[in-house]
Amino acid sequence: MSDMHSLLIAAILGVVEGLTEFLPVSSTGHMIIVGHLLGFEGDTAKTFEVVIQLGSILAVVVMFWRRLFGLIGIHFGRPLQHEGESKGRLTLIHILLGMIPAVVLGLLFHDTIKSLFNPINVMYALVVGGLLLIAAECLKPKEPRAPGLDDMTYRQAFMIGCFQCLALWPGFSRSGATISGGMLMGVSRYAASEFSFLLAVPMMMGATALDLYKSWGFLTTGDIPMFAVGFITAFVVALIAIKTFLQLIKRISFIPFAIYRFIVAAAVYVVFF
């Protein structure tokens, strides 16, 4: 593979990662399809995907840096409030409660989960995740019990964490699982999305660090330019995607995302079967 060709592939996959990582559409499903079409598969490809996820994580840190510092007791200016008056304040305990279920299951069944990374499982996960998004829109309370991020209870945070376990199924979408769970628990669409992004930072950093440790042997110095392009592209595109997504969900429901998931599932079937 020539240098220019590999850099082009890195840029394309960086765009795909940045666009889909935090949308409820499954970045895994998209990366599998695009990687297959580009002929970029195997151990190096898997390591590359792990590295560029760090770019997406960095985008969340940049977007929510004030809120993240606030979780550890460092505040800049007035406390942040979004989408409704605050009755309390989101704390690090909320994040920890949202992490525990998936962390426990992820550590216990890490190898089993990795064995599920194949097109057929991803295809089914895309469909089931789409159905969950539709269920969340149809069954959510008419008036959210937690209109703002700071209105969330510990119970809601923990239940969102339980829904996050669904994302251990490759192709399900971590953001889709957590946002749907939040809405079903009475958290507003916007606040559930914000919490999903905040929860992504420790969850994805932990999972990425573990995957990177296990994949370290596949890295070579020759891969650095390609990985750097993918990382930077994913970071920039994820920044734009997050900003756009948070504005978009104020105006539309998640039904279009569910329909899109069904289309991607059909694409997986066409490409691989």
Swiss-Prot record:
InterPro entries (UniProt xref): UppP (IPR003824)
GO MF terms held by the record: undecaprenyl-diphosphatase activity
E.C. numbers: 3.6.1.27
Keyword match Hydrolase: yes
Subcellular localization(s) per the UniProt record: Cell inner membrane
Keyword terms: Antibiotic resistance, Cell inner membrane, Cell membrane, Cell shape, Cell wall biogenesis/degradation, Hydrolase, Membrane, Peptidoglycan synthesis, Transmembrane, Transmembrane helix
Superkingdom as given in the UniProt entry: Bacteria
Reaction(s) catalysed (UniProt annotation): di-trans,octa-cis-undecaprenyl diphosphate + H2O = di-trans,octa-cis-undecaprenyl phosphate + phosphate + H(+)
Membrane-spanning segments: 6-26, 45-65, 90-110, 116-136, 190-210, 222-242, 252-272
Biological process, per Gene Ontology: cell wall organization; peptidoglycan biosynthetic process; regulation of cell shape; response to antibiotic
GO CC, one annotated term: plasma membrane
Pfam families documented for this protein: BacA (PF02673)
Keyword Cell inner membrane: yes
Membrane topology: Multi-pass membrane protein
Note, other: Bacitracin is thought to be involved in the inhibition of peptidoglycan synthesis by sequestering undecaprenyl diphosphate, thereby reducing the pool of lipid carrier available.
Physiological role: Catalyzes the dephosphorylation of undecaprenyl diphosphate (UPP). Confers resistance to bacitracin.
Family designation: Belongs to the UppP family.
Name under which the protein is recorded: Undecaprenyl-diphosphatase
Protein encoded by which gene: uppP
